[in-house]
Design a protein with these regions (language model features):
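Membrane-lumen/periplasm interface segments of specific transmembrane helices
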Residues: 45-60, 64, 69, 215-224, ...
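Short hydrophobic/aromatic helix or loop-helix immediately within or flanking a transmembrane segment
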Residues: 72-86, 95-118
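Loop-to-helix entry region of an early transmembrane alpha helix in multi-pass inner-membrane enzymes
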Residues: 104, 108, 116-135, 292-293
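Transmembrane and membrane-interface helices of multi-pass
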Residues: 147, 154-165, 169-171, 184-190, ...
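Short acidic/glycine- and proline-prone juxtamembrane loop motifs at membrane-interface regions
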Residues: 171-177
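Transmembrane-helix signature of polytopic, membrane-embedded enzymes
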Residues: 120-123, 140-162, 180
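Membrane-interface alpha helices of multi-pass inner-membrane proteins
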Residues: 161, 182-187, 195-222, 242-245
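Transmembrane-helix motifs of polytopic, lipid-linked glycan transferases
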Residues: 112, 127-147, 304-308
Length: 336
């Protein structure tokens, strides 16, 4: 009599097989490819810009590197990094421009980096700006890929590198640092990681005054999530409360330093920056030649139309169940 053949006992569910391991490796490789394309595309746009700058600098006999790290706002940030706050310039018309108009995170990074690397604060500013540019492109890619797929993510990252004033991304300015913090904060919102979103938003609030828009976005996203899920997560509440702390802390610091609760806004007003409900924009458009004015109005109208279309289509929307922007029937657990 032949012996019965016993069936093989199945591997435990947690034991990886060669096929399973290979599949995971393939998935990771495929996930890295679009990200590499996004970052490579962004770097290419910046290298083209730097190449043009080098050609112009050589033709005019000027120092191109100095234009990147030693002009306009860059000078103010370097002075803060090296000497702290307290510098003012009085204009011929009597207006006073104070360095308190500039937020502290970027010069703090310049100061810290120049302390550990053999570079001055101005060069450290370029290192921060260029590194943050890559981080921003990565974050923009993640947001786009989460909402619309990998192709959308790649296109968004590259387009950010070629928008009309993208040249400042190559300078020792705060645009790249702020954009990186904003992009990753919004990505954290999309993933339901509210505490991470709040912390990144708070850091953005120490970088630029435009963080108020990011603070509003985090708050609105939380409200939408509460309406859709009909519950409030403690992590969501914590993230929303943390989000404005950076911006509020600096505004309070300026107020205490200058002994006036409106000191920060007074400083900004002296620089010609204020919220006027669009009056300054209307005056700017009215002062343009008619062709330029017409083109700008058409662009603004198209932008408004695009916003309407996005709202009608329910954008942004993702199929991921971890997103607060999923269909209302999807249950989401907020995470930090």
């Amino acid at each position: 009599m032949s012996r019965p053949v016993l069936p093989r006992s199945p591997l435990p569910s947690g034991t990886p097989t060669r096929a399973r391991t290979g599949a995971r490796t393939g998935l990771r490789a495929r996930a890295r490819t679009p990200l590499a394309a996004a970052l490579a595309g962004y770097v290419a746009t910046r290298l083209i810009g730097l190449g043009v700058l080098a050609i112009v600098a050589a033709a005019t006999g000027k120092d191109g590197l100095h234009r990147l790290k030693g002009r306009w706002d860059s000078v103010w940030y370097v002075r803060i990094a090296e000497h702290g706050y307290g510098y003012e310039v009085t204009l011929p018309n009597g207006d006073v421009h104070s360095d308190l108009a500039f937020f502290p995170l970027f010069p703090a990074l310049e100061r810290g980096l120049s302390a550990v690397l053999p570079v001055d604060a101005a060069t450290a500013g370029l290192v921060v700006a260029w590194s943050a540019g890559l981080a921003a492109a990565w974050g923009i890619y993640r947001c786009g890929a989460f909402v619309g797929g990998e192709r959308v993510g790649v296109l968004l990252a590259v387009l950010w590198g070629v928008y009309p004033t993208a040249f400042v991304q190559s300078m020792a300015y705060t645009e790249t640092l702020f954009t990186a913090l904003a992009a990753w904060s919004l990505y954290a919102v999309l993933r339901g990681r509210w505490i991470a979103a709040g912390v990144l938003c708070a850091a953005a609030g120490l970088t630029r005054p435009t963080a108020v828009a990011l603070i509003a976005a985090v708050g609105i996203a939380a409200v939408v999530t509460v309406v859709r899920e009909r519950r409030v997560s403690p992590r969501m509440v914590a993230g929303v409360l943390v989000a404005p702390l950076g911006w509020l802390a600096y505004v309070a610091y300026v107020g205490v330093r200058e002994k006036s609760p409106t000191a920060y806004f007074d400083v900004q007003a002296a620089w010609g920056n204020s919220i006027d409900g669009g009056v300054a924009l209307a005056r700017f458009i009215a002062g343009l030649p008619w062709a330029a004015s017409l083109g700008l109005c058409a662009a603004l109208a198209l932008l408004g139309r695009l916003v309407v279309l996005c709202v009608r289509q329910g954008q942004p929307r993702s199929a991921s169940s971890s997103s607060p922007w999923s269909e209302p029937r999807t249950s989401v657990r907020g995470r930090g």
